[in-house]
Amino acid sequence: LKKFSDTGERLPVIGMGTWITFNVGNIIQTRNQRTQVLGTFFKLGGGLVDSSPMYGSAEEVLGYALDRLGRPQPSLFSATKVWTPFPSRGEWQIEESHKLWGLQQFDLYQIHNLVAWEHHLQTLQQHKQEGTIRYIGVTTSHGRRHQELEQIIQTQPIDFVQLTYNILDREVERRLLPAAIEKGVAVIANRPF
């Protein structure tokens, strides 16, 4: 487990992303297989599960799996994203994600690939104050917009950043990781392999 905030809260260092793998539609047999995968993940100490409205049916399948595994799952650290260029749709996506997952509170809500981040950050801050979100994050991948992401880390009240980091793509080591360390922002590596 790794400490990630001033609260002393800890998370396993390996999480589960749901892009492609949980976008299985309404096929019950496949949904049940994903439920088994999620159950095994929790049983073996996993916690962070990351999704997005961009991932097709993934959030709906997660809600299905969580219903069958029993609620609450004590080790679940729920993470999803808002992903729309239209500020008015952001609030709808947030409400829809709560319904699909069957959660009243998300542990982490992120702005996907910095899309309309200025507006969505305000919306997420309001939700954090209301208690429907515990932590706020921003994401990017494939080395895009690193300069902008660094500025956000340095100037905005965020708790997490999610970015591409692996043996072949180590660009973030130069500026983004040091900025996150300096500001106390937790880092989630996507595409680690």
Please tell me what each predicted stretch does.
Residues 1-76:
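N-terminal binding-site loop/beta-alpha segment at the start of enzyme catalytic domains
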Residues 4, 16, 41, 49, ...:
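Conserved, mostly hydrophobic/aromatic
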Residues 5-11, 63-75, 94-104, 124-130, ...:
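Acidic (Asp/Glu)-rich catalytic clusters
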Residues 19-32, 79-88, 113, 139:
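Active-site mouth loops of central-metabolism enzymes
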Residues 26-42, 86-102, 119, 143-153:
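Short, acidic/polar
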Residues 46, 103-106, 133, 158:
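A structural motif
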Residues 113-193:
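Beta/alpha (TIM)-barrel catalytic core signal, keyed to glycine-rich beta->alpha loops juxtaposed to Asp/Glu
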